[in-house]
A protein has these predicted regions:
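N-terminal [4Fe-4S]-dependent radical SAM core
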Residues: 1-12, 55-58
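Structural motif
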Residues: 9-11, 23, 91
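Local cysteine-cluster metal-coordination motifs and their immediate loop/turn environment
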Residues: 15-30
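Short beta-strand motif preference
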Residues: 12-14, 119
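Conserved non-cysteine loop/helix-boundary elements of the Radical SAM core domain that shape
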Residues: 30-55, 59-163
Length: 163
């Protein structure tokens, strides 16, 4: 890693490529059959983050996307960011699938500074969800929003697809 110290704040995107099912519209690098690699992948991400941390003064935003980040163990995911120089006002986002939102995971996220959830809703219309290859239903979305709000997260993004 270069010895250049980055003086300005900047953002980090972490791609978590694991999914329970590949959505029909998805063109991202994702895996549905490699759960055995989750722990090694997250450990490699943690090692890379530690190596880069020596050049980072302040991280202004973190976005964990995928894939389905909330499909992997929340504590292992959050361990990647322990000790990194997050700015006190950093926006820290985890992308979530409505089928996998749990109070326990949200508690871990909040304890590690997550203050924004991006919920992969795509649609609230059952036949549209089916045509997209999505497994969740509108009730899962309502339940997920309630869990997210109860965890104290006020900044919530709902991803929607139109067209």
């Amino acid at each position: 890693m270069s010895q250049v110290v980055l003086r300005n704040r900047f953002g980090i995107y972490l791609h978590v490529p694991f999914c329970s099912k590949k959505c029909d519209y998805c063109s991202f690098a994702t895996w549905t059959d490699r759960d055995h690699l989750v722990e090694d992948y997250l450990q490699a991400c943690k090692a890379q983050a530690r190596e880069a941390a020596s050049s980072i003064r302040s991280i202004s935003s973190v976005f964990i996307g995928g894939g389905t980040p909330n499909l992997v163990p929340a504590q292992l995911l959050m361990d990647i960011f322990d000790g990194l120089p997050l700015h006190p006002d950093a926006e820290f986002t985890v992308e979530c699938n409505p089928d996998h939102v749990t109070p326990d995971d949200l508690e871990i996220y909040v304890d590690h500074g997550v203050n924004r959830i991006s919920l992969g809703v795509q649609s609230m219309v059952p036949h549209v969800l089916a045509s997209l290859g999505r497994e969740h239903n509108p009730d899962n979305v309502h339940n997920s929003v309630e869990i997210i709000r109860n965890a104290g997260i006020k900044n919530l993004n709902l991803d929607l697809i139109y067209g």
